[in-house]
Regions:
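Active-site loop/helix belt of alpha/beta enzymes
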Residues: 171, 186-311
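Conserved, mostly hydrophobic/aromatic
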Residues: 65, 88, 118, 183, ...
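A charged N-terminal "starter" segment
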Residues: 1-143, 428-432
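A non-catalytic, amphipathic alpha-helix used as a structural packing/dimerization or gating element
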Residues: 63-71, 203, 236, 240-243, ...
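Active-site-proximal beta-alpha core segment in soluble small-molecule metabolic enzymes
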Residues: 84-228
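C-terminal accessory subdomain/extension
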Residues: 2-6, 334-432
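Active-site loop ensemble at the mouth of alpha/beta enzyme cores that anchors a bound cofactor
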Residues: 270-359
Length: 432
């Protein structure tokens, strides 16, 4: 399901990222690269280990990244799903371009600020998996939609009050194109956003129908918020979602829609989404079954390693962790204690602490980081417990596996993309 998008060419918004100058803003990059453009530095194909990079430095595996992109393209295609990966994970336009090149329908956003960034980099299809009731943001969206007939935008609605605020802002803006919305079905009591009952959803749909500024095109939600989730509970909620789509269609609520959107899917239950969406009966119009997983692009060595649906369906693929945070041993004050120069400012820690994986000595030899455990993080230090007999010296580099892609990307503005031997071939720019 490939779509037209801004090519990564020198004159495109993404291509112009290569013209940005390397300087003090980008931690970990070689000090002697100051003043070079990102493209010039990439062309030098420096070694991550001997090319002057300073620690800590986060690197993305080129091989793992490409593997993950291909895996989810195959998976979504095999299950007849359109794919709008959640861009909040990386906020990296270069990765958006690669996701689109691998067949993505568009990119999912979480807040209006994301949408503005996506548009600055030429994204033509955006699914905002959230409510938007900010008048200033809605005025901007109205201008953007009116100025570009090819721009497709969809947002959640979950309350008549939200619909009222959207309608007022869009009327004030003089919007000429209706803004497409999907009714969000909440995942259950105590869950996040979303109308809680089918009756609540119908009331929201009625409110949309009463406006001239909004167009109801489908239903959506996030199964990851199902309370005490397991396969049975998640599938039961997903069947509520598809039943809502069938009911709304039977009531001709999608009469103005070019296609009917049914959307769900984080990174923990996309197998359940695929199963239940496959059961959806034929509706009155074409159906866009839209999956929105995001963490897959880098995967991880912690939380998502344990919860990925590919653990349940290994014959359909496997994701590879793409992140490695390299830090240096700066202190060994006690026999069982060492400190690395990477901390909360550098590594995700909201779900799990980093996992030591490899020790690299100054002479370039590498060995497994057996006997090392990260026990805590300070702002700029990792606390390492060192088992007796473990060889670890001040000056050694330690590779850390990370847990939770969303809070790994956000700590780095420019991330080296490295091949297996450490050759850096590109730099991924993020916009957090």
């Amino acid at each position: 399901m490939a779509v037209d998008h801004a090519a990564d060419t020198p004159g495109s918004p993404v291509g112009r990222l290569a013209h940005e100058r390397v300087d003090h803003r980008f931690k970990g990059l070689p000090p002697d690269a100051e003043g070079r453009t990102v493209g010039e530095l990439a062309a030098e194909r420096r070694s991550l280990f001997t090319g002057g990079f300073t620690t800590p430095v986060l690197a993305l595996s080129a091989e793992a990244l490409e593997h993950n992109l291909a895996v989810m393209e195959r998976y979504s295609t095999a299950h007849g799903l359109a794919f709008a990966p959640h861009g909040k994970t990386s906020l990296a336009p270069q990765l958006f371009e690669r996701q689109l090149a691998h067949g993505a329908w568009g990119i999912t956003a979480a807040v209006p600020g994301h949408v503005r960034m996506y548009r600055a980099f030429g994204i033509q299809r955006i699914f905002l998996a959230n409510e938007v009731v900010d008048a200033a943001a809605l005025r901007w969206l109205a201008r953007e939609l009116d100025a570009d007939p090819g721009f497709r935008f969809i947002a959640y609605v979950d309350s008549p009050r939200g619909v009222e605020l959207m309608d007022a802002a869009l009327r004030e803006a003089g919007a000429r194109r209706p803004l497409d919305v999907v009714v969000e079905l909440g995942a259950g009591p105590g869950a996040r956003t979303g109308a809680r009952t089918e009756a609540d959803c119908a009331a929201v749909a009625d409110a949309v129908a009463a406006t001239g500024t909004l167009r109801l095109v489908g239903v959506a939600g996030y199964e990851g918020e199902v309370p005490k989730p397991d396969g049975e509970r998640v599938r039961a909620w997903l069947r509520r979602l598809t039943a809502l789509a069938v009911a709304f269609d039977g009531e001709s609520r999608f009469a103005d829609a070019d296609e009917i959107v049914v959307s769900a899917g984080g990174s923990a239950w996309f197998d359940a989404v695929a199963d239940v969406f496959a059961e959806l009966p034929e509706l009155s119009g074409p159906v866009l079954k839209l999956l929105r997983s995001g963490a897959y692009v880098s995967h991880d060595d912690g939380h998502y390693r344990h919860i990925t649906p590919f653990n349940r369906v290994p014959d359909e693929g496997a994701l590879h962790p793409a992140f490695r945070l390299w830090a240096q041993v700066v202190s060994r004050p006690e026999p069982g204690q060492a400190f690395l120069n990477a901390g909360k400012r550098d590594a995700a820690y909201d779900l799990d602490l980093p996992e030591p994986q490899v020790i690299r000595s100054p002479d370039g030899t590498e060995r497994p980081a057996t006997g090392l455990t990260v026990t805590g993080l300070s702002d700029q230090h990792a606390w390492l417990a060192v088992e007796e007999g473990t060889s670890l010296e001040v000056g050694d580099w330690v590779a850390l596996g990370l847990s939770h892609p969303c809070t790994s990307f956000d700590k780095w503005q420019l991330i080296p993309l490295a091949e297996a031997d450490g050759t850096v071939t590109d730099y991924i720019r993020t916009f957090f």
